[in-house]
Regions:
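Hydrophobic membrane-insertion alpha-helices, especially the h-region
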Residues: 2-17
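Extracytoplasmic beta-rich repeat domains
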Residues: 97-110, 125-127, 143-162, 190-204
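Residue position within the beta-strands of beta-propeller blades
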Residues: 116-118, 170
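Short loop/turn segments that connect beta-strands within beta-propeller blades
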Residues: 134-137, 181-185, 192
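Short coil/turn segments that connect the beta-strands within blades of beta-propeller domains
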Residues: 113-114, 165-166
Length: 204
């Protein structure tokens, strides 16, 4: 009988303790940095790796076309192109030689040494993409891109690359600067202006 009473008391104490136990009192709220992991080891979901991806599409010999448009509003920033080629200004209609689809936005291309460059935005991949085309055929030669999720704000891409012999430089809508080789598409460097310089992205 004594053993039975003792057993009942033990089980009763366990049952009461189980009901009174509050597990939340022993939980620690996990916050970033609580594990003392050095910064930069773990990639966050919103991290942008500028120029992370690359695709080469076509090989094409240099074009004989000499027209150039090297940046915003042209070489002299006056919206004037100088060319020895004669343009028939009296033509009623100009045939479309080639075209390509882009994402929504207000970006414009640059033209240099027979190639066309434009900073596009791919909504399906959430990516800024520097695309290089042949001026003569319209074939895409290469593309370098990086993931940067954005919300539509009067479209997406809205800037114009700038180009010289050794560099083509872009700046994305979120302040990501990317410098590539104009011929090969190789990444030279990238800067996240928000992270490095604490800049603010304007509404427009």
């Amino acid at each position: 009988l004594l053993i039975t009473v003792a057993t009942v008391c033990i089980y009763t104490a366990i049952l009461v303790g189980w009901h009174l136990y509050v597990p939340r009192e022993n939980l620690t709220i996990q916050v970033p940095g609580a594990d003392n992991r050095p910064e930069g080891l773990a990639r966050k979901a919103n991290d942008v790796v500028i120029g992370e991806y690359f695709m080469k599409y076509e090989e094409e010999p240099p074009s004989g076309l000499t027209g150039e448009w090297t940046g915003f509003r042209g070489e002299r920033f006056d919206n004037v192109v100088e060319t020895p080629d004669k343009i028939n200004t009296e033509a009623g209609d100009y045939p479309v030689v080639w075209s390509f689809e882009t994402g929504e936005g207000h970006a414009a291309p640059v033209i240099y040494k027979g190639r066309v460059y434009v900073l596009d935005y791919n909504e399906s991949l959430n990516s800024d993409a520097l695309r290089c085309f042949s001026l003569e055929s319209g074939k895409e030669l290469w593309r370098r891109w990086y993931r940067v999720p954005m919300k539509r704000n009067h479209g997406f891409s809205r800037t114009v690359p700038v180009i010289r012999d050794e560099y083509v430089i872009t700046i994305g809508p979120q302040g990501h600067v990317m410098c590539c080789d104009p011929v090969t598409g190789d990444l030279k460097w990238g800067i996240d202006m928000q992270k490095q310089f604490k800049t603010e992205v304007p509404f427009w």
